[in-house]
């Protein structure tokens, strides 16, 4: 079953709510850790064990259940600790995850937390740590009642134009990055599943903001994407059951490149 993460605690809280220790480098500012683009690096100003803290402004906000640190970071093999607390001093922190990291995309489940303060701690002093995003959000996935229609696709986008001139010379133009698109149709959507896709459309439809998408096949890496269209809100059955109608929803997404 596919899954989606579009909530982003740091982006919602804003740049002023983020504290990096050691402080962020002037040339790699902290806002890049929450801008949602994933590849524009934020960097600590000195080589030291480091923390990234988000003050969400209040407790009881939407839970965080997943963390993403996109590929391109220099964290390497560390034991990164994610914690939350109801006060900024972290006198009684709750550990949400301890992650043995590696190169490439870091994705890990978190113990659900609605506490006000979130902290990511990176040990070691070998480097001034840098990363493209500290994305802590809520994972949402359709229930087992939803059917993913066969034939979903993840093809590369056509990004090259080839021209042949009268002289016989041939030239090509690359239009944008090497991106993939995802087209997926889901049927028997109702109840909380219908709410999920309505929320998704409201938050991300028309490429308003990027989101992480886990494809139906676990072998496909989780990908940061734009939701370009959500359509085909079509009733599945001509004679719906007494519990109410179900719907078919079609998603069209394109890979987001930072």
Language-model-derived ranges and their functions:
Residues 1-51, 57-63, 68-79, 87-88, ...:
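Extracellular/virion structural assembly segments
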């Amino acid at each position: 079953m596919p899954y989606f993460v579009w909530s982003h605690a740091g982006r919602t809280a804003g740049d002023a709510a983020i504290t990096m220790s050691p402080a962020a480098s002037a040339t790699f500012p902290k806002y890049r850790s929450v801008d949602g683009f994933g590849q524009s690096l934020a960097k600590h100003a000195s080589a030291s064990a480091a923390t990234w803290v988000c003050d969400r402004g209040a407790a009881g906000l939407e839970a965080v259940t997943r963390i993403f640190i996109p590929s391109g970071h220099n964290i390497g093999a560390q034991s990164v600790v994610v914690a939350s607390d109801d006060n900024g001093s972290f006198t009684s922190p709750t550990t949400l995850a301890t992650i043995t990291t590696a190169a490439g995309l870091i994705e890990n489940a978190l113990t659900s937390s609605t506490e006000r303060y979130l902290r990511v701690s990176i040990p070691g002093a070998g480097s001034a740590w840098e990363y493209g995003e500290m994305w802590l959000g809520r994972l949402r996935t359709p229930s087992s009642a939803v059917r993913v229609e066969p034939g979903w696709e993840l093809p590369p986008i056509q990004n090259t134009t080839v021209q042949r001139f009268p002289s016989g010379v041939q030239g090509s133009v690359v239009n944008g990055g090497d991106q993939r698109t995802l087209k997926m149709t889901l049927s028997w959507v109702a109840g909380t599943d219908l709410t999920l896709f309505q929320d998704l459309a409201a938050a991300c439809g028309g490429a308003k903001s990027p989101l992480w998408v886990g494809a139906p096949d676990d072998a496909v890496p989780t990908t940061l994407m734009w939701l370009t269209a959500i359509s085909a809100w079509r009733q599945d059955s001509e004679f719906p059951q007494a519990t109410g109608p179900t719907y078919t929803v079609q998603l069209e997404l394109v890979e987001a490149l930072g």
